[in-house]
Structure formats: C-alpha cells, structure tokens
Amino acid sequence: MTATPLTNLFLRAPDITHVAPPYCLNATWQAETAMHTSKTDSACVAVRSYLVRASCETSGTIHCFFFAVYKDTHHTPPLITKLRNFADLVNHPPVLRELEDKRGVRLRCARPFSVGTIKDVSGSGASSAGEYTINGIVYHCHCRYPFSKTCWMGASAALQHLRSISSSGMAARAAEHRRVKIKIKA
C-alpha cells in the first residue's frame, strides 16, 4: 500500500470554517472502552450525555474536551461522516507530529482526536424544545490531573491545531480550484 500524499488528504478534508473553544466534558472514561461508552453529566439540571468515540491504544483513564465545529457562517454543523474524515486527518501521523512540535511534548496517544456527541434532553414534563444534539471533535487526554493548567494548555494547542488544519484544507481546495481553472483556460 502506498502512502497518501498530504495534499490529497487536505483536499478531502471537510469544509470547517469555525472551531469553537474547548468545552471540558464532566466525566472520565476508561480508554479501552471509550469508543462505545456514553456518560451522563451529573452536574447538569437536564439530562446531558457525552459520547466520545475515542479509539485509544493506551490503557487507563481519559478525560475529554469537546470542540463544536461549523462549516459556514450560519453555524451549520458538518455531517458525522465529514467529522470522521476530519478526525482521521488530524490523527494522521505526519499531521499529528505538527501538534507535538507546537507543544514540544510527545503525546501519549496516537489517536487523541475523535468524533463526539453531546446530547441534552429536557427533564420529565418539559417541552422537547430544549432538546438538542451537537456533534463535534473530541480531544482526549491521559494526564494525571484532569483539567489542570497543563491539561488546558494541551486543549488550547489542540484548538490551534484543529483551526490550522481546517484552514489548510480550505487553502488546498482553493488552490486546486485555481489549478483546474488554469487548465481549462489553457
């Protein structure tokens, strides 16, 4: 199997124009079972659950940050399939090394990004108008002290990484569009 050139990966990246700051998920998971384990936030008035879909090769406890992502100025969220493509791109080893280089720290995990879901359901007797589901990108962390200063610095670096990669995808598509126009004129 031949390696896929990074330019091709960026061309297939979904349109993501906005990555919101991280939201820490009030739960912890076991890395080995985090792919299919939903957790409920006990601190919320409404019933809020988190599904992080992390596929981690490292064992132990993880905690997560959620990034809402949008594909346009109307805050339209991308489809889950597009989010999976984006998570695969940011987890691609050469792309992930950029995050390690920016932080100056080696990550403990080869796939720290995944697609996550926050589902908020109104309490019993309340109208369904308050119910919502948000899909986005999750960054999970293995640090010893969840949501410590070091942990938040990692989440901040992850935010910058996601924004950089989404910008690179848009730039690659724009450049490809220009190349196609030039070929058509020639």
Curated annotation (Swiss-Prot):
Write one Pfam family the protein is assigned to.
Herpes_UL55
Question: What UniProt keywords are attached to this protein's entry?
Answer: Host nucleus, Virion, Virion tegument
Reply yes or no: does the keyword Cell division apply: no
Q: Single Gene Ontology BP term?
A: viral life cycle
A cellular-component GO term for this protein: host cell nuclear matrix
Q: What is its main location?
A: virion
Q: Does the keyword Signal apply?
A: no
The domain of life for this entry's organism is Viruses
Location(s), subcellular: Virion tegument; Host nucleus matrix
The family this protein is said to belong to:
Belongs to the alphaherpesvirinae HHV-1 UL55 family.
The identity of this protein, by name, is Tegument protein UL55
From what organism does this protein derive?
Human herpesvirus 1 (strain HFEM) (HHV-1)
Source organism phylogeny: Viruses, Duplodnaviria, Heunggongvirae, Peploviricota, Herviviricetes
